[in-house]
Structure formats: structure tokens, C-alpha cells
Amino acid sequence: MKIGFWTWKSIKLSIAIPLMCSHVSSALRAELGLDEEAFGTAAAKKYETLLEKKWTSIVRLQKKIMDLESRNAALQTELANLTPTALSKRHQDPASWLPRSVRHSLESHRDTINSIAFHPIYSSLASCSDDCTIKIWDWELGELERTVKGHTRAVLDVDYGGPRSSILLASCSSDLSIKLWDPADEYKNIRTLLGHDHSVGAVRFIPSGASGTLSSGNLLVSASRDGTLRIWDVVTGYCVKTLRGHTAWVRDVCPSFDGRFLLSAGDDMTTRLWNISGSNSDHKLTMLGHEHVIECCALAPFASYQYLAALTGLKAPPASSAAEFMATGSRDKTIKLWDAHGRCLGTLIGHDNWVRALAFHPGGKYLLSVSDDKTLRCWDLSQGGKCVKTLKDAHERFITCLRWAPGIFKNVPGVSTRDANGESNGVLNTGLKGDTPDVQVRCVIATGGVDKKLQVFAD
């Protein structure tokens, strides 16, 4: 192994300085080829703790190696004990994968976890909390990587996104601000966006480009307790658009995959679909039906169209269409499915408390939900929304958030890294043809709750 000149010199000095007052200092100095000034006070001060620091680094690396060796041994044992039945289950079609047991239960937050977000490339997972912090985890290893501080009140939402060259983490807070953090620079706060008049409850990067060019651009949307949605340019930090229509707190916002539409919902018990593709952001549609505050909303992926279209008795819309179907979850304990005409296609009943978050399965067949009843439920859209799986007591207290790790979009020229992820657990062709990309699905989801725990479900 090659050692650089200055590294070698620092090692020699680290050994030599503690002996500088002994009778061997002259001989040692001659042996190492050091002059008189090498043992000066300045040099001693500079190098006196160097050896200790080097050994500390070595100990940390050794611990990391031992952890990896332990994990490797466990995986080898698991592989050796796999039966044909277990092997077939492990390599099941990602389109039918549903969460089972928890891989990692992560703890470090000191208060309720409000939101989580997966990094689009690495195995990093961000979580935010009422404790005013953001924490970055390695979900593969189940380790805390760092704690990010900057907000002065509860952090309510986080999201990864941005252009290919510079993926960012966005966060929003009860301190009325939105902050942008650079993962490539140790999550340094590079910009703070101000403009909302009350707590900012949700933030999402807006994908840019037409169907088949699924790249996240420079736009970010935020939803606030002041009743507005704001669209920001993350490069300049300017608010480029303010959307008004809601009459109370806007709890959630979801952009369409092509960036042309926004779906929002909130305390006024309405769900609103916005067309933001033109110079004027038209309020396209208002959906009414819930009997209490709407906590969450989600736009269905194209893979779900065939199942949801069957509920209308019509043919599935083309892959190029966006915002054709959607789902909302409410404090009235129900989930509602809607089409782009504002018609309620069905109401999913089963939760015993507020529905707090929704996520469509990338394979299209299922809708996942979490609730204050401490359960995670899986609804089969091919069976009209029947609940086919319930994970009871997934958390010890209310479950507040749910995220599915974003998948890999293939065959897309110039695709953004926002849509390019790390290793997947299977390949799934969603049925998109022509220039529209195939998708590799990562069978990984995460949930967070009032119990301050982050649960990672993965195969």
C-alpha cells in the first residue's frame, strides 16, 4: 500500500514527539531524517493528537467491517436454509409484493415523525419530526447517518428531487419556511424560501417534461395552513405562482408524473385538481364527498388505470394521460377513489381511525394506507378495493406517514436521477409502450409514527 509523503511524515512525527524529551530524541531525529525544528512547540501542538485520531478512525472502520461481516454471515445462513417454497416467495413478482415483517425499526427522534422520503439513487431515507430535526438514515443497513438541524419549529414534510445534476432535499415547517439542503455537501442548507403566512404542511418537487421524459426539474410546490399552494423556482428561490381556492389548511399536495397537474386536499373537506401546464393555473376540478378533514391524497400511476377504469365500466385511458384517477384519505376513517370527472368510484371502509397517508403500489394492483388505528392496510383494486391484508400494530401508536421507494425508469433519454434508483428487488414492466419507459420496482416501503419509530419493510 502506498503512503503519501505528508501522511508518512505525520506518522513519523506522531511517534517521535512523545519521545522528544527523552535521551533517544537525537538518535531518533537522525534516524528519521528530521531537523531540529521538527520537535518545536508548534509541531508538537499540531501532531500531539494525530495518532489518537488515526486510531479512532481505524476503530470506526473496524466496527463497520464487523457489522458488514455479521450481516453477510446472516444472509449466508438465510440463503443456506431457504427451501424451494421460501425461495419462490422471496423471488415473487414485484407486482404482487406486499409488506410483511419489519426489516429495520429505527429510533433516534425525540418526538412524532411527520414525514419520510427516499433518496432517488442511494439507500438514504430522510425523516422529519416535531423535534425540529431531519434525520438521514441508511435503510439498507438500518443505521443513522446524520441529523440535520436548521428549522426552529416542527418539521412537517420532506421530499427529494431536483434536476439530474443536483438532487436536493426539501423540507417545510411550522416556522413558516421551506429549506433546501444539498446531500452532496453534507446536507448544507443552501436556500430558505419564505412567503407563506402560516405553517407549511407539505412540499413536493414537480416533475418536468412530457410523458416519457420523467425528469424532475427546478420547480417545487408547497401547501400551507394559510390556504394556498405556492410554486417555487429552487434555483432562484422565487415564488413563481400562488394557487388560491381552498378555504382552510391545505394538508397534502401531489404532482402528476408529467408535472402538468397538482392534486390537493385539506381541512375544507375538498379535493382539488389544478392544471398548471399553461400560463394560467386553472382550478380544473373540485371533489366533494368526505365528511371530515382530508388528510392525504394520491394520484394513481398508469399501471392502476386498468383496475380503476373497470369501476367506471370504461376503457382504460392511454398511458400519455395524467391525473385520470386519484385517492383521498380522511378523518372520517374512509378512503375514496375518484376519476378525472370528479365522480366517486368507491369508498373503502375498514380503518377505525383517521386515515393519514396513502401510496399506490407501483404494480398498479394495490393501494396501501396507514391510520391512527395503528394498522397498515392493503386494498386490492382488481377486486373493487377489497382489503386483502392488514398489518396490525405496525406501530405502537398512531401511524402518521407512508412512502414507497421510487422505482427505476428505463429507456428514457436524459432521464433525471430523481427517477433512477439503486438496486431493485425485481423487474416489472408496467405495460407502458413506445417511448414510455419500463419501470423497475423496489420492494421497499417505510412508515413513521407518534411512537417516534421509523419502520422499514423490505425484501
Swiss-Prot record:
SMART domains: WD40. Residues 56-83 form a coiled coil. The keyword Repeat applies. The keyword Transferase does not apply. Belongs to the WD repeat LIS1/nudF family. PANTHER family: WD REPEAT DOMAIN 5B, WD40 REPEAT PROTEIN. This is Nuclear distribution protein PAC1-2. It comes from Uncinocarpus reesii (strain UAMH 1704).
